[in-house]
Design a protein with these regions (language model features):
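Conserved N-terminal diphosphate/IPP-binding helix and adjacent helical/loop segment
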Residues: 1-80, 129-148, 155, 159-160
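Active-site alpha-helical segments that house and flank conserved acidic catalytic motifs
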Residues: 42-61, 65-81, 87-117, 180-203
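Alpha-helix capping at helix-to-loop junctions
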Residues: 98-109, 128, 132, 171, ...
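Active-site helical microenvironments for divalent-metal-assisted chemistry
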Residues: 102, 140, 144-147, 168, ...
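Long amphipathic alpha-helical segments that form oligomerization/scaffold cores
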Residues: 108-143
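A mid-sequence, solvent-exposed acidic-amphipathic segment
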Residues: 151-155, 159-195
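Active/binding-pocket-proximal capping segment
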Residues: 201-202, 207-212
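Conserved small/polar residues in nucleotide/adenosyl-binding loops
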Residues: 216
Length: 216
């Protein structure tokens, strides 16, 4: 369901592209350093957007550097890391884990079960670090799953539930920006859900999987 919030490369300036890539690579390195390769493969462009947004808003002290990786073994890539990349890495792993749990319970995807087992020990610490967010995300994913099982056809209701999950991710701190960030996360989450439903509708109909647009 993720991967829709990406940069428009043909329209972006070189310096802005370099800035974007540095935060993307920074989040990638953060995931690897905190959670190993199992965390690193959960990297998404959507969470990179969250990093850039929150970094621009809060302006935390940002560490700049460069590094090589498997994807770029020869040329070093610019990297930016800060407290926002740490938070985003945590949220990325937390959300990935509980989404895998739901995929296993709903569709019995063996790959989802295996991945959730790998992340399980790491997520226990995150549950303690972010108890309110963890409970909220679990509850909302469970509600989303139940509505899918019941064949809910109100796409706005379904999208709204996913929007509430994203608003939890966007609300980094309880401060003057919280309400605005929650609202932004909510509507962006709805947008992501709607795009995903539209993209998958033909395949879901063919495979007899749930999709709120399947009977339109």
């Amino acid at each position: 369901m993720f991967g829709y919030i990406v940069m428009n490369k043909p329209e972006i300036k070189f310096k802005d592209f370099d800035l974007y890539r540095s935060f993307y690579c920074g989040l990638c390195r953060e995931l690897k350093s905190k959670y190993g390769i199992s965390g690193q493969i959960s990297l998404t462009y959507d969470m990179t957007f969250v990093v850039i947004l929150l970094s621009a808003l809060y302006e935390p002290r940002t560490q700049k550097g460069s590094t090589r990786c498997i994807i770029h073994p020869v040329c070093k890539q610019p990297v930016r890391r800060n407290t926002v990349t740490e938070y985003a890495a945590d949220m990325n792993v937390l959300l990935t884990y509980y989404k895998c749990r739901d995929d296993w319970e709903d569709e019995k995807k063996v790959t989802a079960l295996g991945y959730s087992k790998v992340l399980q020990g790491k997520v226990k610490k995150l549950d303690q670090k972010y108890p309110d967010k963890s409970r909220r995300i679990q509850k909302l994913l469970s509600e989303l799953s139940e509505m899918e099982k019941s064949g809910e056809k109100d796409i706005d209701k379904m999208a709204g539930c996913f929007g509430k999950i994203m608003e939890e991710i966007f609300a980094w701190k309880q401060d003057v920006w919280e309400d605005t960030l929650r609202r932004m996360g909510f509507f962006l989450g709805k947008f992501i859900y709607l795009l995903d439903a539209y993209d998958d509708v033909e395949e879901d109909i063919k495979n007899k999987n749930y999709n709120p647009r399947s009977e339109e």
